[in-house]
Swiss-Prot record:
Keywords: Disulfide bond, Glycoprotein, Host endosome, Host Golgi apparatus, Host membrane, Host nucleus, Membrane, Transmembrane, Transmembrane helix, Viral envelope protein, Virion. InterPro entries: Herpes_glycop_M. The chain crosses the membrane at residues 24-44, 95-115, 144-164, 167-187, 227-247, 262-282, 284-304, 328-348. Residues 45-94, 165-166, 248-261, 305-327 are virion surface. Belongs to the herpesviridae glycoprotein M family. The keyword Cytoplasm does not apply. GO terms for cellular component: host cell endosome membrane; host cell Golgi apparatus; host cell nuclear inner membrane; membrane; viral envelope; virion membrane. This is Envelope glycoprotein M. Interacts (via N-terminus) with gN (via N-terminus). The gM-gN heterodimer forms the gCII complex. Coiled coil: none annotated. Envelope glycoprotein important for virion assembly and egress. Plays a role in the correct incorporation of gH-gL into virion membrane. Directs the glycoprotein N (gN) to the host trans-Golgi network.
């Protein structure tokens, strides 16, 4: 009896601890969801031209069509012309795409966490993870991850508000802080702060507890990591432009200094990011194409922006105009090819890993390949049968026409008037 009472007390204590962990996690998740919704609402409010509200459109950071020659500390000074050249930055459409794409991905993250909370609330899931309530919720997102995500989205909202008031230097500084926080958020969300072997074992153990939980922390989580990687890649490239914006509006620089700074910063961050993806994050999510897709999108945006910028302000470059233009195209082209090669290497290594381990994903891929080959064979056979049938029909038609021509030839022979001669 005493042992049974002790077990009941332990059970109640564990259930109470799990209840507290669940409530704390739910509060953090709700705060994260509210922050994301408020950020999306701020974007919409800052995009609408109203008499009351934000003074300016937040995405109109630079306008290359007009050059301001009165202000001195809002751009790059060009001594020979006595004017001011706008700083290299994404134009309005690219800025709108970046912020709204980020908000949409974070809305998906909120939906993912919400579904995870519903699945974790099942009785058999709670019974299986009795005494480790914090662990079951960390399978979706740990409390630290949610906290970093909330701070990151709040800082990005502050960037939107500051941009709407045209405080460019403050916006760049806040964005760089946002970049540092979302980097930690991205790392914790991808790996949960555990070793890759532990990560795989946790996913595998969830298969015997609940199938929906296993799919959520396995396949669905991998999809969310890929979506977040797309956005983070563009965030990384945007950080180099914000860094150039901060330098250009804080110090006296020449025209080409900011362009070179942006290219060098982007190149260094891209190299570090590719190495981290290949040797660290790929241990958790093997097929992580989102990072490369995001980099290609970001480099495409940067390439078009840089080309337009250099073409518009060609006069301000002086004798180094052609060299700077060639350097911009060369650096961006080399890194675009490097990103494509890294993506091919990742695909090859992922396929070799799944083939060596004979995983379910590899089995599904092989089954899909066999189905495609079978369908192609069926199409070829049907095409050959149709071809043979058409040839038979053509031959039959030709034979019938030949017989008809012979009959016509016979009936065309008429009597010429004599008994021995027939005229055609």
């Amino acid at each position: 009896m005493a042992s049974r009472a002790r077990m009941e007390r332990n059970y109640r204590g564990l259930s109470h601890i799990d209840y507290v962990h669940k409530k704390m996690w739910v509060v953090q998740a709700v705060c994260f969801g509210i922050a994301v919704l408020v950020f999306f609402g701020t974007l919409v409010a800052a995009s609408i031209n109203l008499t009351e509200g934000f003074p300016c459109f937040f995405a109109a950071v630079v306008d290359y069509r007009t050059v301001n020659t009165t202000l001195v500390h809002t751009g790059l000074t060009y001594p020979r012309l006595g004017g001011v050249v706008p700083v290299l930055f994404f134009q309005t459409k690219a800025v709108v795409f970046f912020f709204y794409a980020t908000s949409i991905v974070f809305v998906f993250l909120v939906c993912y966490i919400t579904v995870g909370a519903i699945i974790s609330s099942k009785k058999h899931v709670g019974a299986a993870y009795m005494g480790s309530g914090a662990f079951v919720f960390s399978l979706m997102a740990s409390p630290l991850t949610i906290l970093l995500g909330t701070v990151s989205i709040w800082l990005l909202q502050a960037v939107v508000i500051v941009l709407a008031h045209k405080l460019i230097v403050l916006a760049a500084a806040v964005y760089l802080v946002h970049f540092s926080t979302i980097t930690f958020f991205y790392g914790y969300f991808c790996g949960r702060g555990v070793d890759s072997k532990v990560y795989a074992e946790d996913i595998s153990s969830a298969k015997d507890i609940d199938g929906s939980l296993h799919k959520l922390i396995g396949n669905v989580r991998a999809m969310m990591v890929n979506l977040l990687s797309i956005v983070y890649s563009i965030i990384l490239i945007m950080s180099s432009l914000m860094f150039g914006m901060l330098l250009a509006n804080s110090f006296t620089l020449k025209f080409w200094h900011v362009i070179v700074t942006v290219l060098i910063t982007t190149s260094v961050l891209t190299l570090i990011y590719l190495l981290v993806i290949e040797f660290l994050i790929a241990r958790y999510v093997h097929i992580i194409l989102g990072a490369y897709i995001g980099l290609l999108i970001g480099y495409g945006m940067l390439w078009t922006t840089t080309c337009d910028y250099v073409n518009r302000f060609y006069y301000a470059m002086g004798a180094n105009a052609s060299n700077l233009r060639i350097a911009c195209h060369s650096v961006l082209a080399v890194f675009t090819v490097l990103i494509l090669l890294a993506m091919v290497v990742r695909l090859i290594r992922a396929s070799l890993y799944h083939r060596r381990r004979s995983t379910r994903a590899y089995a599904k891929a092989m089954k899909l390949q066999q189905n495609v080959k079978h369908r192609l064979r069926q199409l070829r056979r049907s095409y050959k049968q149709r071809g043979s049938q058409s040839e038979d029909e053509r031959a039959l038609t030709q034979s019938r026409s030949a017989e008809a021509s012979d009959e016509d030839t016979i009936y065309d022979r008429v009597y010429s008037g004599s008994e021995s001669e027939w005229d055609d």
